[in-house]
Amino acid sequence: MGIQGLAKLIADVAPSAIRENDIKSYFGRKVAIDASMSIYQFLIAVRQGGDVLQNEEGETTSHLMGMFYRTIRMMENGIKPVYIFDGKPPQLKSGELAKRSERRAEAEKQLQQAQEAGAEEEVEKFTKRLVKVTKQHNDECKHLLSLMGIPYLDAPSEAEASCAALAKAGKVYAAATEDMDCLTFGSPVLMRHLTASEAKKLPIQEFHLSRVLQELGLNQEQFVDLCILLGSDYCESVRGIGPKRAVDLIQKHKSIEEIVRRLDPSKYPVPENWLHKEARQLFLEPEVLDPESVELKWSEPNEEELVKFMCGEKQFSEERIRSGVKRLNKSRQGSTQGRLDDFFKVTGSLSSAKRKEPEPKGPAKKKAKTGGAGKFRRGK
């Protein structure tokens, strides 16, 4: 789930924190990708006639096709991906996981009813709701990545938290996921739609945490409290407090404790045994990979082993897989170039689709030229 309504809230109240780019803009960038989120997207999107791709034994292969070709596309555009896989979910997430199980059970009932009624659109909708990333999906994707020469890491807990830690440490330029709580975990830059289907033609969205905090007038701990009020995977929120009201309350009172002291409990009942303090601690000090111990290396693909796995075991076309390997090898030759802004300071500012910031004048203009977007430039 991530954080409910956070993307829209940022677009509404801190639009300069969002930048849209074409994939070509990320040449030379290292990016930490939430693997489970990507695999889920592949299982949803890579389909034939509404059904997931399968081999003759009935094994699902959509995740492998998606991982293979989307990774090649990133490499061809000069992006160096590292995939981060989920570890053990935190105990605080048990309530959210139980709710998901309930929703799956309900979707199974609705799917059966839709099948009996012959309602094709409803069947497709509820089938997608039942999609779940399994250990087998993860293990097969790890094997594929190792054969492709693409690094992956196992997070001790939530993948997006470790993605954020790598970005904070400067090991990568950004964390890539659809879950907005990557910002809550402190990633300086969050990228959305990086692994989305090309057919959707979605521009990649960048969310810059420093601009979010600046425009909202909050520090990181206050931003975490705002996200808890909006609704997260780790504890309940206060019913009746919408996004705009949550922002107003945090800006005025600075913490959940101060807000609760002033709330009318008859209008805004606080959840019983509310675990907001524990959720705050989890966001501020999550269990993550140690960035200093991480060494990222992209190596040559093992063509024959890839053919053996993807064609021999999973029954993909050998011609297509070998063609993909050629593209991958060619992309590796091109990606040895660095980015110009790794050597020269880049000036400018983030643009917003919603609001263009006024051009500074006089001394302010001179100051803006020497500062600009340098604070957003990350050298990895």
UniProtKB/Swiss-Prot annotation:
Cofactor: how bound: Binds 2 magnesium ions per subunit. They probably participate in the reaction catalyzed by the enzyme. May bind an additional third magnesium ion after substrate binding.
Stretches assigned to coiled coil: none
Co-factor requirement: Mg(2+)
Positions that bind Mg(2+) 2: 179, 181, 233
Enzyme class: hydrolase
Basic residues: compositionally biased ranges: 363-380
EC number: 3.1.-.-
Binding site for DNA: 47, 70, 158, 231, 233
Disordered: region residues: 327-380
Region (Interaction with PCNA): 336-344
Residues annotated with Phosphothreonine modification: 336
Stated name of the protein: Flap endonuclease 1
Organism of derivation: Rattus norvegicus
Gene that produces this protein: Fen1
